[in-house]
């Protein structure tokens, strides 16, 4: 019989942290799961750390990419091999509360494709909770994702596998904000609901984070703005220009990016954002002229 939930974990050079993540999975009150851990061609002993769990529990499955494909590529590898009707994508350095799987699974109804939960943000250096992701996602959330009124973290969503496959999985060319890209696309075909309970500890800080840096942040923002440009400009132009201005300000901070990176970002910015700004400036000019005509 196939398991009810497939947990998919990408791992790259995670030998120091992945064991605690997998131990938390073993502690789940919901037992009918498989966990596919995808080693993204690591250079350290990540494989050996994973194989210790595979050896003691057959629910763990080891997969390995022949070349490094990034977190999204590893997630797609896991999705391709998943057997369950429900999938949960999880990061290799975060922790599940023991009732995560049971709580999300029992919260599903026939008219829902995605169940999300809340997440605590834990600072590694301070070893304490510093924030909470307590966004509420109900029904069709496509509009709310574009306007940034809601957010869905990678870890916090149990999803029907067929809707993941329907949108083609994760975008492997997305530099950052992969979960934003994924759920903008997923929300076009899926209906969401939120279990208002903290069930995950999301760790930030320290020297072992997977994705960090101004360069990747801006490149990811520009990727999203370019990919969904028409949707932003039609429904939420202010969100589009707000993110554009934030990206521009980060590019100007040369302390955070080197010259080569800055040149690449400026080129992306010119190609993606500048034409829309020209349209905005033109519209503002028409508005000013209209106001002058009204005053006369």
Q: Where is each model-derived feature located?
A:
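C-terminal subregions of glycosyltransferases and related glycan-biosynthesis enzymes
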Residues: 203-296
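Short aromatic/hydrophobic "clamp" motif used to bind/position activated sugar donors
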Residues: 87
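Conserved donor NDP-sugar-binding/catalytic core segment of glycosyltransferases
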Residues: 99-130
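Glycine-rich, basic loop-to-helix element that forms the pyrophosphate-binding segment
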Residues: 65-82
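Cell-envelope/extracellular polymer assembly enzymes that use nucleotide-activated donors
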Residues: 3-6, 34, 181
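A conserved acidic beta->alpha catalytic loop
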Residues: 24, 31, 39-48, 67, ...
């Amino acid at each position: 019989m196939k398991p009810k939930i497939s947990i998919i974990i990408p791992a790259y050079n995670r030998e120091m942290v992945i064991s605690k993540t997998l131990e938390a999975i073993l502690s789940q009150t919901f037992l009918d799961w498989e966990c596919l851990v995808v080693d993204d061609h690591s250079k350290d002993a990540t494989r050996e750390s994973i194989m210790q769990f595979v050896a003691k529990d057959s629910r763990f499955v080891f997969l390995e990419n022949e070349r490094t494909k990034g977190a999204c590529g590893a997630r797609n590898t896991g999705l391709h091999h998943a057997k369950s009707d429900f999938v949960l994508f999880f990061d290799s350095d975060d922790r599940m509360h023991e009732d995560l799987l049971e709580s999300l699974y029992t919260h599903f109804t026939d008219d829902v494709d995605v169940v999300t939960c809340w997440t605590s943000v834990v600072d590694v250096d301070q070893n304490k909770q510093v924030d909470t992701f307590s966004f509420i996602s109900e029904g069709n959330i496509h509009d709310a994702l574009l306007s940034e009124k809601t957010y869905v973290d990678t870890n916090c969503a149990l999803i029907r596998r067929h809707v993941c496959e329907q949108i083609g999985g994760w975008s492997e060319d997305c530099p950052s904000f992969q979960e934003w890209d994924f759920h903008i696309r997923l929300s076009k075909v899926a209906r969401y609901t939120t279990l208002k309970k903290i069930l995950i500890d999301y760790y930030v800080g320290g020297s072992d984070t997977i994705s960090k840096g101004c360069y990747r942040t801006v490149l990811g923002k520009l990727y999203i703005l370019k990919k969904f440009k028409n949707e932003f400009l039609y429904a939420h132009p202010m969100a589009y220009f707000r993110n554009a201005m934030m990206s521009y300000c980060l590019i100007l901070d040369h302390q955070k990016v080197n010259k080569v990176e800055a040149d690449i970002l400026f080129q992306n910015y010119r190609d993606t954002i500048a034409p829309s700004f020209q349209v905005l400036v033109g519209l503002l000019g028409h508005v000013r002229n209209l106001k002058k005509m009204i005053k006369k």
